[in-house]
Amino acid sequence: MNTPINYSEKFGQTLQEIDHAVATKIESMTSTPFESSTAKLFAVDYVRGEVPAIRLIAEHADIYEMLDDTLNAVLLFDSGYNGFAVVTTGWAAPIDKDNDDNNEVAPSQHPERRRVRLMTMMHNGKMGSSIRFTDEESVTYDEGNAMGSLASAMQDLYDVVRALKVSSTKQNERQLP
């Protein structure tokens, strides 16, 4: 009897393999992988069982401007890759549920601050992310529960790249005899 495919498990594996490849790429690019003044956009090509191909497309000080740049959508489309990922770094600090005043302190000024690196990816229409801390070996994964402005900007870029693919396909069909 065949075991049914668990798509969430498959996506979890995809997320982890792409995250590992992106982390390896970042770590090969710099000696300070948790301290970058720019967000990075990567094209990602992945087929299960293969090593993901990762290519740097753009860097920008403002992740939202980078994701909103139509040229980056064209570069992703031209890459022919089936996904993309963004990486950004910063500070994280614990949230004090009992004392809202402590939550007013910027993470970079908080006494318990930690350096963090966030990788968020879109692959075949699904979004996932990973969070890594400098002082921790383990990685925290989120398989599709992303919400907020970054998730919206990622979805918008994905939609533009898809529209380019659809437009290109229709253009090629019109040229056939």
Residue map of PLM features:
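Short HxH-centered metal-ligating active-site micro-motif
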Residues: 65-104
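N-terminal interaction modules that seed assembly of large macromolecular complexes
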Residues: 20-68
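Glycine-rich, aromatic-bearing surface loops/beta-hairpins
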Residues: 99-177
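Extracellular/luminal recognition modules and glycoprotein regions
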Residues: 8-26
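Compact, glycine/acidic-enriched structural inserts
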Residues: 2-9, 58-59, 75, 139-153
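Eukaryotic short linear interaction motifs
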Residues: 50-52, 95, 128
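Catalytic cores of nucleic-acid ligases and guanylyltransferases
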Residues: 1, 50, 177
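Short, surface-exposed beta-edge/turn micro-motifs
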Residues: 37-42, 81-83, 114-118
